[in-house]
Amino acid sequence: MMMLPEACIANILAFTSPADAFSSSEVSSVFRLAGDSDFVWEKFLPSDYKSLISQSTDHHWNISSKKEIYRCLCDSLLIDNARKLFKINKFSGKISYVLSARDISITHSDHASYWSWSNVSDSRFSESAELIITDRLEIEGKIQTRVLSANTRYGAYLIVKVTKGAYGLDLVPAETSIKSKNGQISKSATYLCCLDEKKQQMKRLFYGNREERMAMTVEAVGGDGKRREPKCRDDGWMEIELGEFETREGEDDEVNMTLTEVKGYQLKGGILIDGIEVRPKT
């Protein structure tokens, strides 16, 4: 193997993974040269990477090396007038997207009495949406599978924060769903905020009968018997899993990702929406 010419090694590396190509430099100088070649990294770049770069709003693209382009895409890229965030996993090459709050459908989000829009310091997007008051929470995002990695199981996650003055978010679980035109369906339910035990005791005292009735309508308990709630992210936000779906080679499908809470009829507010992330499941 050590006696193989550089071009032959590059051909072999192109059929491995980005992780293997990154580590090849540790083998020998010939492997390092082969592992840095444009031929290898062209294989790992998304087929539409030039289009993605042309849509970029936060990079100056004067890089000639395909490996460096790959590294930049791993750092994430704002595209589509900064309404979407594109990213590839450094070691697997799998594609992820984040659809901003402006790029998804939020019922009544254009009415200032229901929602307010503002810049949030730890968001990559220029605006996030904060719920002021509503009795019907309906959120929907759409994505085409052709822009994602083929033959991959994906999860969709609503990125949120709950403000200190939030109310009405923990009385009734929200319903989540994933639907695609090819027939994939994933349905579940989750609470919109983490449940505080003291607040739960007060809620049961005042709303016990109503809560029992609603629990019969919307179940928000996972297979492990635990309540489904938002989970903390590394970026300071929280995420609510909406469901999962699979992509297939050569297939172009539209996936609808939704969260609704319309059965409780109670007023609610104080949840901040940053967008929906679509990423490969580990």
UniProtKB/Swiss-Prot annotation:
Residues 1-44 form the F-box domain. It holds the Pfam family PP2. It comes from the Eukaryota. Keywords: Crown gall tumor, Ubl conjugation pathway. Induction: By Agrobacterium. GO terms for molecular function: carbohydrate binding. InterPro entries: F-box-like_dom_sf (IPR036047), F-box_dom (IPR001810), PP2-like (IPR025886). Disruption phenotype: Impaired Agrobacterium-mediated tumor formation. Component of SCF(VBF) E3 ubiquitin ligase complex that interacts with VIP1. Interacts directly with SKP1A and VIP1. Forms a complex composed of VIP1, VBF and Agrobacterium virE2. Component of SCF(VBF) E3 ubiquitin ligase complexes, which mediate the ubiquitination and subsequent proteasomal degradation of target proteins such as VIP1 and Agrobacterium virE2, after their implication in T-DNA translocation to the host nucleus (can functionally replace Agrobacterium VirF). Required during Agrobacterium-induced tumor formation. PANTHER family: F-BOX DOMAIN-CONTAINING PROTEIN (PTHR32278), F-BOX PROTEIN PP2-B13-RELATED (PTHR32278:SF15). This is F-box protein VBF. The gene is VBF.
